[in-house]
């Protein structure tokens, strides 16, 4: 597909996403609200994105005000939707849940809308990250040339519907993403960055070439069968634990934005029980079981690349 067709599809899908979100906004406002609870987290200021997080204060909002915050949050896709001092590198998060009473017909309509929105989000992510053929260093420029100020992570995040949950409770997850990679995988990634022709701030073009070249040399010196891992810390994330009484089943969802619970109630006793999200305190985290990890040597700090020793 040529570049102009790709750009046209990017713009068409985004226009359709905005229209789909607006349609869902109207559908949700027309439904009877049973309960709503969202938890506002502090905005991340520019320059503080990579600082370790030790404490997150939480501010709860309930009822119609929570519903309005949630609907607004689904549509916050651009930098200009947030304050001037707020980082554009860190996506906004608003964990929580909205509970609506629905008929069979209303449920089908809302499910169709959410499925359509999520499909558009997935297509946009695929266009930007795969079909563009660009390394990550060049995607920012590509996106902001055609959709200036777009916050890609907010755009990619899908909306999660729940059908007749018995309870929704909240907590925090703190973990690493660990991925086994080969020496050839890493060299291919580094060479792609070297040939991209664009430095990553705060490096100048010359500094960037020097850094990548040094990283390539370090990896090339390894034996072919070296066991390599990318072990990248994931910033603490809000999660929701959803319990379904009839199926005797619990499902855990990441919760960067409010879940939407659709309830077909026979009585008030069936109203889902909603939990609170307490403040996060890193010093209070207790691990039930933490297995001994194999010793690792940090090889390329920028990529969180480790050598198993």
From Swiss-Prot:
InterPro entries reported for this sequence: DNA_replication_term_site-bd, Tus_dom1, Tus_sf
Pfam families (alphabetical): Ter (PF05472)
One GO BP annotation of this record: DNA replication termination
Listed transmembrane segments: none
Keywords: Cytoplasm, DNA replication, DNA-binding
Main location: cytoplasm
Listed GO CC annotations: cytoplasm
MF-aspect GO terms: DNA binding
Subcellular location: Cytoplasm
Signal peptide: none
HAMAP family in UniProt: Rep_term_Tus
Family: Belongs to the Tus family.
Role of this protein: Trans-acting protein required for termination of DNA replication. Binds to DNA replication terminator sequences (terA to terF) to prevent the passage of replication forks. The termination efficiency will be affected by the affinity of this protein for the terminator sequence.
Descriptive protein name: DNA replication terminus site-binding protein
Source organism: Yersinia enterocolitica serotype O:8 / biotype 1B (strain NCTC 13174 / 8081)
